[in-house]
């Protein structure tokens, strides 16, 4: 099972983890960020205001230090979503085009579409080999996590195939 914490620990290297968690602080809504600030302050015995004043990159670094903490799972899920929709929309669009899923800049904006089957996911990974394999694995794991159901059934087996070669050092 690919949780947000597992994706960040097992698939993302330090650079990807930093980019993903920085995206949370740059693109997240104020309520999401406020919850994360309170959680970080509590976990680190800091005042909320101390964390609030930090640069997004520093707050991302603090979050990265909590990647094993279950109480941050929702924050990490939001970070993955924000990273992909803001920083990886071109790659999302390329995969969605391969699967015939209507989208706008990588964001699915309709309810009436058929999620890809596992063979279609494998074929898209093969065809779109110009994209970094780590980026692809993180995307597919996050898609299965965030979209659930048929998406999970189609993407996670492919992530399981890609993951052994991507374990961070």
Question: Each predicted region: which residue ranges?
Answer:
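Charged, amphipathic alpha-helical stretches
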Residues: 1-35
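Short, charged, intrinsically disordered terminal tails
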Residues: 163-169
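Short, aromatic- and cysteine-enriched interfacial helices/patches
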Residues: 2, 6-11, 54, 101, ...
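N-terminal low-hydrophobic presequence detector
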Residues: 1, 95-98, 169
């Amino acid at each position: 099972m690919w949780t947000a914490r597992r994706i960040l620990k097992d698939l993302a290297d330090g650079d990807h983890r930093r980019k993903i968690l920085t995206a949370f602080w740059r693109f997240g809504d104020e309520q999401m960020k406020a919850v994360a600030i309170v959680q970080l302050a509590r976990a680190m015995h800091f005042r909320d205001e101390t964390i609030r004043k930090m640069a997004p990159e520093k707050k991302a670094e603090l979050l990265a230090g909590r990647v094993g903490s279950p109480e941050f799972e929702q924050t990490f899920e939001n970070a993955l979503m924000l990273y992909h929709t803001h920083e990886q929309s071109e790659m999302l669009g390329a995969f969605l085009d391969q699967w015939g899923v209507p989208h706008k800049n990588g964001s699915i904006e309709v309810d009436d579409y058929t999620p890809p089957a596992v063979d279609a996911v494998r074929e898209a990974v093969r065809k779109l080999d110009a994209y970094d394999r780590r980026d692809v694995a993180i995307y597919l794991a996050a898609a299965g996590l965030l979209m659930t159901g048929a998406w999970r059934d189609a993407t996670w087996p492919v992530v399981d195939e890609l993951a052994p070669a991507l374990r961070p050092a």
